[in-house]
Structures are given as C-alpha cells and as structure tokens.
C-alpha cells in the first residue's frame, strides 16, 4: 500500500506565494486553491498512491506552545488573502473525495509523523509532501519526503530519501533533530545554542552522534573553548529545542489501513465550486467533465 500525506498548510502557503494573486470577477481569491490542486495532480501522478490524507493545522495552541511561550512567536499571521481560501480549499478536497485530518493541540507535522510511523509498522510506503524541512527527520526506508522547493527561481519537488539525506548532510535522517537542537530554528523561534550555526551543529553531530553525545564529550579537544562555553551555558535551551523540534508519532488520529482511501466525494458540488471559482481548466483534469 502506498500512502500520500500532504502537509496542507505548507503546500497551500507555497501555492499562495508561488502564484500571483488571482481573483474571480466578483473578487474571490483563488491562487492558493489553483496552485494547491495543480500540485495535488502532480503528486498523484508521481506517487500513484492507494490512499491520500491532507493534514492541516488548527488555530488552537499546541502542546509546544504550552511548553515554550516563545514557540513560533515571531511568525506573522496568515495573509487574509490566503485565509479566505483555506475553507474553500478544504470544501473542494472533500467534494473531490480526499479526507482532511486535524488534531487539536497537535501540528500537521505530527500527523505526518504519526501516519509515516503507522506505514512503517505495516512496511507500507509513505510519501510526505511538504515545504517544511523539519519533516526530513521522518525519512526512512519506508518514508520519502517530497520537498516543495525553489530551485534556480523555479518551484519544483525534490525527492528526499535516505540516500539523499546521507549525501546532503552526511548523517542519518533521525539525527537531523540533533542538529536542530544545537543550531535552533529562527522560523519556529526555537532557541538552540548561542553561537552554533548549521555547519558547526552538523560537524558536532557527525562527530558525536547526538545532542547527548555532544554533552557527554564536552571536554573533547575537537570542541573549541568558545563552543564549549556556549554549550554549557545553553544546555537547558538545547534540551528544550530537542523536545520542541522532534516530530511526534503518536497524534490521536486514524492510522488504520483504508482510513484514507479516496472516496466518491460529491462530483457535482466540485464542478459547481470550480466553476464559481472560475478554475475551469481543472474540471477535466480531475475527471469531472
């Protein structure tokens, strides 16, 4: 069985910023919807999945926000032009037969992680479509990340499997969280250790294996005095960053095989909505004509 899991917020965000604002004659924004559905069609062609789940974040604070007040505190809110499109996108996905999944108090990342773990337990293939590099820690023999990226000014999907992680970072996928706990993450406002950037964090993890391994070898001569000083001062922040950055695999969602089989949906409603949105070109591409 092959499961495709789409990080709904991430891909919608990519679609929104990757396509100029489009509106209907009566002023409804449509660029994120149009871009998302085009990406969905490309993913279906590339993965040929048996089941599809689309994970979305909820507005409610997650366990990470409750753990650390600063978590994602520097992020700007969703642009209103995108926010207006999100409920319409979800309605369209349902009409097309695709199941969306959310979990209060959890992030879409954790839904991806939970479904990937369920697939691994069954030895099923799982494809995670996202623009968020955090999900690379989930890559395994059964899980491949399809990373939406901008290469040479053009949007494309980069396939990240175990070999690709080895080639790019020189470590195992699961060790990427060890790197993040040291370097932090400005986009999520995860603190990390002061003065430790990606290059140094990677080198430390390549040498000592993990955050725990780094702290077990603080007196090793390969750790520079200034690095040692920062590591000692910021150990609580590094440990907090490790917890915040680790994608969970136990979100309270359906994980049984068959839970995300594409249904009949409501084709007539999908056609009406696409016509209202003046996205006529997608009607035949989804087999709705």
What are these regions (language model features)?
Residues 48-50, 121, 142, 159-289:
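Non-catalytic nucleic-acid-binding/docking modules located in mid-to-C-terminal regions
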Residues 1-129, 133-155, 159, 237-240, ...:
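Noncatalytic, basic helical substrate-engagement surface that gates or grips nucleic-acid strands
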């Amino acid at each position: 069985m092959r499961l495709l899991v789409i990080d709904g917020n991430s891909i919608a965000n990519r679609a929104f910023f990757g396509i100029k604002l489009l509106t209907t004659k009566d002023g409804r924004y449509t660029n994120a919807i149009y871009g998302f559905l085009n990406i969905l069609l490309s993913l279906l062609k590339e993965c040929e999945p048996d089941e599809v789940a689309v994970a979305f974040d909820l507005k409610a604070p997650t366990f990470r926000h409750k753990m650390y007040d600063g978590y994602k505190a520097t992020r700007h809110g969703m642009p209103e032009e995108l926010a207006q499109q999100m409920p319409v996108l979800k309605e369209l996905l349902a009409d097309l037969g695709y199941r969306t999944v959310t979990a209060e108090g959890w992030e879409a990342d954790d839904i991806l992680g939970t479904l990937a773990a369920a697939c691994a337990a069954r030895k099923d293939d799982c494809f995670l479509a996202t623009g968020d590099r955090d999900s690379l820690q989930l890559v395994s023999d059964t899980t491949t990340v399809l990373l939406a990226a901008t290469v040479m000014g053009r949007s494309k999907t980069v396939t990240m499997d175990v070999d690709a992680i080895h080639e790019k970072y020189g470590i195992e996928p699961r060790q990427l969280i060890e790197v993040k706990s040291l370097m932090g993450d400005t986009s999520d406002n995860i603190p990390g250790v002061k003065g430790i950037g990606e290059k140094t964090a990677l080198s430390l993890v390549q040498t000592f294996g993990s955050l725990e391994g780094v702290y077990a070898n603080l007196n090793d001569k390969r750790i520079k005095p200034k690095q040692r000083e920062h590591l000692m001062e910021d150990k609580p922040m590094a440990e907090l960053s490790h917890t915040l950055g680790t994608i969970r695999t136990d979100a309270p969602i359906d994980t049984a095989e068959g839970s995300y089989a594409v249904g009949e949906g409501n084709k007539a409603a999908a056609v009406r909505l696409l016509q209202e949105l003046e996205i006529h070109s997608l009607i035949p591409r989804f087999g709705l004509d």
